[in-house]
C-alpha cells in the first residue's frame, strides 16, 4: 500500500531515511509517500541544495523498491522502454505529459523564498526545462528509480507500466 503524505519527516522517519540512504539526508523538504507501515518511500527535495539546482524533486528512498527497480534496470528494461517511446506516439505523448506533471509539481511546491532564490541564481530555465530526475531529453528514459518515485507521487506513465508489467508495487507491505 502507498500513501501520499507530503509531510515534514518526524525524528523516527529521519532515522529510517538516514539508514535507507546510508547518510543523513540533505535538502529534504517532506516525506512524499510512505508504505502501509509508515516507512518512507519517497522524499520531496528542495529545488536548491548547497546553492545548486537539485534535479530530483522526488527521491526514492525505500531500500526494497530500489532493489526491485535495480533488477529491472539490469535486465535491459530502459532500452525496451526507449524503443517503445520511439515506436508508440501515444506512449511518447503520455511520457511527455509525465515530464510536464513533474515540472509543474516542482514549481507548485516551491515557496516564494525558494522561487526568489532560483531566479537570483539564474536557474529558472533549468528547473523549467529539465524533467523527471533532471533529464533534458524528454524522449529518453534515464533512471527508473526517479520515474517510479514520481509515479508514487504524481502521474508517471513509466511507473504505471512498471506496476502493470512487473508488479513493482506488490513488493510493499
Name the predicted role of every residue range.
Residues 1-46, 50:
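Short N-terminal edge-element motif at the start of the domain
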Residues 14, 74-78, 141:
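Alpha-helix initiation and N-capping motif
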Residues 65-122:
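An exposed acidic His-Trp-rich patch
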Residues 34-88:
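Aromatic- and glycine-enriched beta-alpha-beta binding-site module
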Residues 107-173:
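C-terminal charged interaction modules
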